[in-house]
Amino acid sequence: MQKTEQDIDKTNIAAYIQFTNIAPGATRNEIEDHLELCRRYDFQAAMIAPCWIPLAKEMLSGTGIKVASFLDFGMGNAHISGKLVMLESLMTLGVDEVDYAPNMGFFLSGMYDEFRNEAELMVKEAGDLPLKVMLQLGMIKSKSEKVRAIRMLEDAGVDWIKNSSGGWPPGATDASVEDITLIRETITGRSRIKASGGISTFDQARALLNAGASLLGTSRGVEIVKGAGAAQNPSKEWSKPY
């Protein structure tokens, strides 16, 4: 259900945020700090790299905060056999939600059957585990082809469709009201929407939720909750909002 501006304010927006730290050089201490912030602000989920899932499960136990992770981030061109093994591994670790990158090369080549079949196999392997697909809308040039990709993924049974991976590889674009609206107008309601990429202020976050997103992926969760925007965030390696 689409939210209204009256429904979303600084007191409840944390419930829509998957607070993200997937920095390749993130240390254990940095991840522990990240998870403490998840607890303090009661974010919907902590999005962290697979290697930190056991730590996150331990630190967030009993909080109701979900542990989310990813596979084949950005690239999406691992063979499906490898993706299925990675998904099984994440499930064994106890992950609550998984974001995965589809093979955009298949779609852009017109290999639509292969693109859809990959999604169907991932959905089958995931079972009841919420699965989000990082559709790189910025790589698709025409609106009609964007609609085709969205419909294929929903028809395959994917639980969530994202506008992009959020920050990498080149071609991954920031979340926009236009893209979120397009997804909302295309899906039938079987899939839900997660917005990702460049989300750094409260007003931006609220606009994306009002456009149809039900989750936000961002490394700027604290700034958004405080309504401060990205200006207060110190410059760091891998600082692009996810």
Where do the protein language model's features map onto the residues?
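Glycine-rich, proline-tolerant flexible connector loops at the mouths of alpha/beta enzymes
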Residues: 35, 39-55, 73, 98-116, ...
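Catalytic cores of alpha/beta
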Residues: 57, 78-92, 140-152, 185-195, ...
